[in-house]
Amino acid sequence: MPSKAENLRPSEPAPQPPEGRTLQGQLPGAPPAQRAGSPPDAPGSESPALACSTPATPSGEDPPARAAPIAPRPPARPRLERALSLDDKGWRRRRFRGSQEDLEARNGTSPSRGSVQSEGPGAPAHSCSPPCLSTSLQEIPKSRGVLSSERGSPSSGGNPLSGVASSSPNLPHRDAAVAGSSPRLPSLLPPRPPPALSLDIASDSLRTANKVDSDLADYKLRAQPLLVRAHSSLGPGRPRSPLACDDCSLRSAKSSFSLLAPIRSKDVRSRSYLEGSLLASGALLGADELARYFPDRNVALFVATWNMQGQKELPPSLDEFLLPAEADYAQDLYVIGVQEGCSDRREWETRLQETLGPHYVLLSSAAHGVLYMSLFIRRDLIWFCSEVECSTVTTRIVSQIKTKGALGISFTFFGTSFLFITSHFTSGDGKVAERLLDYTRTVQALVLPRNVPDTNPYRSSAADVTTRFDEVFWFGDFNFRLSGGRTVVDALLCQGLVVDVPALLQHDQLIREMRKGSIFKGFQEPDIHFLPSYKFDIGKDTYDSTSKQRTPSYTDRVLYRSRHKGDICPVSYSSCPGIKTSDHRPVYGLFRVKVRPGRDNIPLAAGKFDRELYLLGIKRRISKEIQRQQALQSQNSSTICSVS
C-alpha cells in the first residue's frame, strides 16, 4: 500500500491510449485504474489512478527533489444546450454538493465545498470538480438510487471517481466534448404506462374532468353489462357512435353528445311493455322517462294571482312578476290567475308569452267572465301531459257580469294529478260568512275530472273536488281582511323600518277561520313575509288615501294541499311592489312538487298548444329587441362631441 507522501509525487509521462477511444470510468489522458483485488504494479508498469486533487508520482522517488509546480489549467468552456431555470440550477447545485461530500467521506477527508486541500507542505492546493459532474446538459447524473447502488459495488474500489463515472457509462468527458466530439446523451427511460381506464365514460374522474352537470343524472340507475359494438355493425352510411363503448351511463352522453338517449337493441327485443303498468319498460309516462327528465322527481312550479282592477293599461314589463330576482332559474310550469282582468284577454296572454319566451308554450287557458287563468309549460314537457279539463262556478247569481266566482283547470303530469283553482270571493270587511259560503259552493260545484281517471279514487270524495287530485293549488282574491280597523293596522305598519308582520297576521280573518276548520280544510299557506297587498293608490306605494280609508289587508293569497305529506315544498312566497297599475299587488309562490310515474292508458294532450299565440309572442319579442337596438344606434350617432 503506497504511502500518502508517495501519492503526492509528480507523475511520469504515461503511454497515451488510441485517439478517439476513451475507456468507461477513466479520464482521458490518465492511466487506467487498478481494479480492486489485483496484484501490485510491477516495475515499469503504469501507476494506479489517483484522486483528482493529487497528481500521480512514481514510487521510489524523493518528493521534494522531483516536485515541480503544476500550472493551473483553465477550465474548458461548457457547452450549454439550453438555458437553465432557477429550479434546474438549484437541483444541479444540490446534487453536485452531495456528490462531493460523498466522495470526500469515502476518502476520509472533511467536506470543503468542492475543493480538497493537500496535506503536503509543498504540494500545490487546487480544486478539482469531477468531470462527470459537469453542469452541462448532456452530463446530468442518474437518480440517487442508481448512484447509491453503484457506489456500493466492489468495482469502485479505492477510486473515488470510479463509482460516479461508472454510473453514467455513456456520458462523454467534458474535454472530449470540447474537442469537437458529438455529445452522447443517455438513453431515455421508457415512460410508465398510464393506468388502465374503464370503458365507463361516466366515471367519477371523467365526470370531474369534463365538468358534467350534477343535475344530468342517469335515467338507468341499475347496472348493465358492457356494450361494445363493432364498427361494421353500424352500417355503411352511419358514423361510429361515441357511445359504442359506454356501459349504461347516459349522464356523460347528455352533456357531451346529445340529449337523445340511445335505445338498446336488447330493450327493444324484450317484450316487457305492459299497457297501464307502472313497471312497463320504455313507457312514455313510466319511471325511466320520469327519471330522465326529473332525476329527483321534483318539478318547479310558479303560481301567481293578481287582481288587475279592470285596467286596460298593462305594465311595461312583467319580468319582476314572472321572473323574480330570487329565482336563479325559470320554473317548469307557470300558472297565472287574474281577477277583474283587462278587457283584451288575448293581449294579456300575448304579453305573458312574450315575457316567458320561446322555451314555454301555452298548454291551456280559460276564462269565466273577468276571471282568467293561463297555464304555460316548458316546450319539451308537453308530451307528458294529459288532456286539460276546466270547470267554472258563479257565486253571484244576480250580476250580469261574472266578477265573482271560481275557475278550475286540471290535468295529469306523468302520474300526478294537478288541480288549479282561482277565485274571487265576496268583498267587504264584515262579510266573512258570505266568503265561507263561496268556498263551499266552489268545492261542491266544480265538476272535475271528467275524462282523465282519478289517480286514487279510494281517497276521493264526491262532496269536495279538492280530494280528487294529488296536488291542489287554490289562489285568488279571497277578500279576507285585517280586523281591528285602519288605525290599528297603520300603527303596526308605521312602527319602524321593519314591519312586524306576525303582529299583523294576528288580525287576519283567513288565518282565524282556517284554524277553526271552517274553510280550506287540509290546505296550507307558506309563511308570509311581505306587506299587505291591498289597497294601494294606483301608481303609488301608499295605501288607500280616499275618503273610504279601506284597511290594508292580505286579500290575495296562494294556498296548497297534497294527498301525500311532504309532496309540496314552498320555496318562496312574496308580492311584486314594482307593479303599480292596480290597487292590488301581484302575489306569487314558488314550489317544488314531487311527481310520480304514471300509466300510458290515460288520454294525452298529444303535444297540443296554442301555436298562434306562440308565434305572436316571439314576433313581439323580436320586434322589441330590434327597436331597442335601433334606439341605441341612433343615440350613439346623434352624440355631439365638442372640444373647447
Swiss-Prot record:
<feature type="lipid moiety-binding region" description="S-farnesyl cysteine">
    <location>
        <position position="641"/>
    </location>
</feature>
<keyword id="KW-0206">Cytoskeleton</keyword>
<feature type="repeat" description="11">
    <location>
        <begin position="183"/>
        <end position="185"/>
    </location>
</feature>
<feature type="modified residue" description="Phosphoserine">
    <location>
        <position position="241"/>
    </location>
</feature>
<feature type="compositionally biased region" description="Basic and acidic residues">
    <location>
        <begin position="78"/>
        <end position="90"/>
    </location>
</feature>
<dbReference type="GO" id="GO:0017148">
    <property type="term" value="P:negative regulation of translation"/>
</dbReference>
<comment type="function">
    <text>Phosphatidylinositol (PtdIns) phosphatase that specifically hydrolyzes the 5-phosphate of phosphatidylinositol-3,4,5-trisphosphate (PtdIns(3,4,5)P3), phosphatidylinositol 4,5-bisphosphate (PtdIns(4,5)P2) and phosphatidylinositol 3,5-bisphosphate (PtdIns(3,5)P2). Specific for lipid substrates, inactive towards water soluble inositol phosphates. Plays an essential role in the primary cilium by controlling ciliary growth and phosphoinositide 3-kinase (PI3K) signaling and stability.</text>
</comment>
<feature type="propeptide" description="Removed in mature form">
    <location>
        <begin position="642"/>
        <end position="644"/>
    </location>
</feature>
<dbReference type="GO" id="GO:1903565">
    <property type="term" value="P:negative regulation of protein localization to cilium"/>
</dbReference>
<keyword id="KW-0378">Hydrolase</keyword>
<keyword id="KW-0979">Joubert syndrome</keyword>
<dbReference type="GO" id="GO:0043813">
    <property type="term" value="F:phosphatidylinositol-3,5-bisphosphate 5-phosphatase activity"/>
</dbReference>
<keyword id="KW-1186">Ciliopathy</keyword>
<dbReference type="GO" id="GO:0060271">
    <property type="term" value="P:cilium assembly"/>
</dbReference>
<feature type="repeat" description="7">
    <location>
        <begin position="72"/>
        <end position="74"/>
    </location>
</feature>
<dbReference type="GO" id="GO:0016314">
    <property type="term" value="F:phosphatidylinositol-3,4,5-trisphosphate 3-phosphatase activity"/>
</dbReference>
<keyword id="KW-0539">Nucleus</keyword>
<keyword id="KW-0963">Cytoplasm</keyword>
<feature type="repeat" description="12">
    <location>
        <begin position="190"/>
        <end position="193"/>
    </location>
</feature>
<feature type="repeat" description="13">
    <location>
        <begin position="236"/>
        <end position="239"/>
    </location>
</feature>
<keyword id="KW-0443">Lipid metabolism</keyword>
<keyword id="KW-0636">Prenylation</keyword>
<comment type="similarity">
    <text>Belongs to the inositol 1,4,5-trisphosphate 5-phosphatase type IV family.</text>
</comment>
<keyword id="KW-0488">Methylation</keyword>
<dbReference type="InterPro" id="IPR036691">
    <property type="entry name" value="Endo/exonu/phosph_ase_sf"/>
</dbReference>
<feature type="repeat" description="9">
    <location>
        <begin position="121"/>
        <end position="124"/>
    </location>
</feature>
<dbReference type="GO" id="GO:1902140">
    <property type="term" value="P:response to inositol"/>
</dbReference>
<feature type="region of interest" description="13 X 4 AA repeats of P-X-X-P">
    <location>
        <begin position="10"/>
        <end position="242"/>
    </location>
</feature>
<dbReference type="GO" id="GO:0005829">
    <property type="term" value="C:cytosol"/>
</dbReference>
<feature type="repeat" description="8">
    <location>
        <begin position="75"/>
        <end position="78"/>
    </location>
</feature>
<dbReference type="GO" id="GO:0004439">
    <property type="term" value="F:phosphatidylinositol-4,5-bisphosphate 5-phosphatase activity"/>
</dbReference>
<feature type="repeat" description="1">
    <location>
        <begin position="10"/>
        <end position="13"/>
    </location>
</feature>
<keyword id="KW-0969">Cilium</keyword>
<keyword id="KW-0991">Intellectual disability</keyword>
<dbReference type="GO" id="GO:0051898">
    <property type="term" value="P:negative regulation of phosphatidylinositol 3-kinase/protein kinase B signal transduction"/>
</dbReference>
<dbReference type="Pfam" id="PF22669">
    <property type="entry name" value="Exo_endo_phos2"/>
</dbReference>
<feature type="repeat" description="5">
    <location>
        <begin position="55"/>
        <end position="58"/>
    </location>
</feature>
<feature type="region of interest" description="Disordered">
    <location>
        <begin position="1"/>
        <end position="193"/>
    </location>
</feature>
<keyword id="KW-0677">Repeat</keyword>
<dbReference type="GO" id="GO:0046856">
    <property type="term" value="P:phosphatidylinositol dephosphorylation"/>
</dbReference>
<dbReference type="GO" id="GO:0032580">
    <property type="term" value="C:Golgi cisterna membrane"/>
</dbReference>
<keyword id="KW-0597">Phosphoprotein</keyword>
